[in-house]
From Swiss-Prot:
It comes from Salmonella dublin (strain CT_02021853). Belongs to the peptidase M17 family. PROSITE patterns: CYTOSOL_AP. Its EC number is 3.4.11.23. The keyword Metal-binding applies. The gene is pepB. It holds the Pfam family DUF3663. This is Peptidase B. Its cofactor is Mn(2+). Keywords: Aminopeptidase, Cytoplasm, Hydrolase, Manganese, Metal-binding, Protease.
């Protein structure tokens, strides 16, 4: 058996022979990471990527200075989408070790689920994986309902049915109730709504291959809110929370939806489809209608919704939108506490009116006259939230997935956002 490479921490700079910018050095005892006191977590994560790039697949984190956040930063950079890596963790107290184990179980589940090929993870499989994860942490407190295919149309989930009907794999709505109180009449504290597009071709507004090749990850919002609920439960969540996952493929077929179609939603809104590649908001609308009907204190939806958010923030931050300044501030505080990157982008009342249609109340996409695509998408969603000015957060989760490796992340899913939402739920 190969001996694990020892990884130690030092606050001293590397020997000058390694260069004045060296973040790690190698010696007979192993590898030393040289912290600078400025961005130690980032330095550890980037160094872990380099260590993985050396082909080292077994490591032992030894010596002083390894706390849970430094351990987690190392794993965030060290984990990759293929191959097996083994880490011998340092001694942590019981609470930190339990927290680390929960992160390894749940956030790795999120990353692995997002990375799964679309052929292996259709709408039904995604919903079932979510159920299995949540049952593994709190099965006695979980009930759920799966509605799929033509049952969605019969129950007036017209956005989800319309988008998903073009695939041989039927669209699915997962409605899951986490109720630790044991009281079936207990108020719902929060609702989480996730976009679960298990593959997005763009439909008849078809994507180019360069934009389609990562679209197995278009269910990143659904995976992240599922992981967030599971993680919050491990941190002691004792309030009732409902989860709505809107799962579908967006494909081309003789039965697929078309430009010019009009979708009539249960809340009375009519939407003209002028871009079948703006499908995420169409499925989320159904989930938000259900969430609003619960009258919770808090609604959070999460979706890989727009390229505009990615243009603004890259893959480095999740974009946050809200009319509720106090609530937005609370989420940003949670993000800072969890060392996760969120950035608030504008959402104003006028964005709700920048989706004009000649044939319906709303268009599902903005025109060239209204180019703020991420903000108008959030404005669209607000039409399906009963009290949109209070208690609602929309997260356009552009940091869930990377098509190519960078200095701190392997290619694929990141798991970012799970800790922040869990923090907010348990604050």
């Amino acid at each position: 058996m190969t001996e694990a490479m020892k990884i130690t921490l030092s606050t001293q700079p590397a020997d000058a022979r390694w260069g004045d910018k060296a973040t790690y050095s190698i010696n007979n005892d192993g590898i030393t990471l040289h912290l600078n006191g400025k961005d130690d977590l980032g330095l550890i994560q980037r160094a872990a990527r380099k260590i993985d790039g050396l082909g080292i697949k077994q490591v032992a984190l030894t010596g002083e200075g390894w706390d849970i956040e430094r351990c987690w930063a190392f794993w965030a950079g060290y984990k990759g989408p293929k191959g097996v890596r083994t880490v011998m963790w340092p001694d942590l107290d019981d609470a930190q070790r339990q927290e680390l184990d929960n992160r390894l179980t749940i956030i790795d589940w999120v990353r692995d689920t997002i990375n799964a090929p679309a052929e292996e993870l259709g709408p039904e499989q995604l919903a079932q994986r979510a159920v299995d994860l949540l049952c593994s942490v709190a099965c006695d407190s979980v009930t759920y309902r799966i509605t799929k295919g033509e049952d969605l149309r019969e129950q007036n989930y017209m956005g989800l049915h319309t988008v998903g009907r073009g695939s041989e794999r039927p669209p699915v709505l997962l409605a899951l109730d986490y109720n630790p109180t044991g009281d079936k009449d207990a108020p719902v504290y929060a609702c989480l709504v996730g976009k679960g597009i298990t593959f997005d071709s763009g439909g008849y507004s078809i994507k180019q291959s360069a934009f389609m090749d990562s679209m197995k990850s278009d269910m990143g919002g659904a995976a992240t809110v599922t992981g967030a609920l599971a993680f919050a439960i491990t941190r002691g969540l004792n309030k009732r929370v409902k989860l709505f996952l809107c799962c579908a493929d967006n494909l081309i077929s003789g039965n697929a939806f078309k430009l010019g179609d009009i979708i009539r939603y249960r809340n009375g809104k009519n939407v003209e489809v002028m871009n079948t590649d703006a499908e995420g908001r169409l499925v989320l609308a159904d989930g938000l209608i259900d969430a609003s009907a619960q009258h919770p204190e808090l609604i959070i939806d999460m979706a890989t919704l727009t390229g505009a958010a990615k243009t603004a923030l890259g893959n480095d931050y999740h974009a946050l939108f809200s009319f509720d300044d106090t609530l937005a501030g609370r989420l940003l505080t949670s993000a800072a506490q969890e060392n996760e990157p969120f950035w608030r982008l504008p959402l104003a009342e006028f964005h709700r009116n920048q989706l004009p249609s000649n044939f319906a109340e709303l268009n599902n996409t903005g025109s060239a006259a209204y180019p703020a695509g991420a903000s108008t998408a959030a404005g669209f969603l607000s039409h399906f939230v009963e009290n949109y000015r209070e208690g609602w957060l929309h997260i356009d989760c552009s940091a869930t997935y990377r098509k190519a490796p960078v200095e701190q992340w392997a290619a694929g899913a990141t798991g970012l956002g799970v800790r922040t939402i869990a923090n907010l739920l348990t604050a």
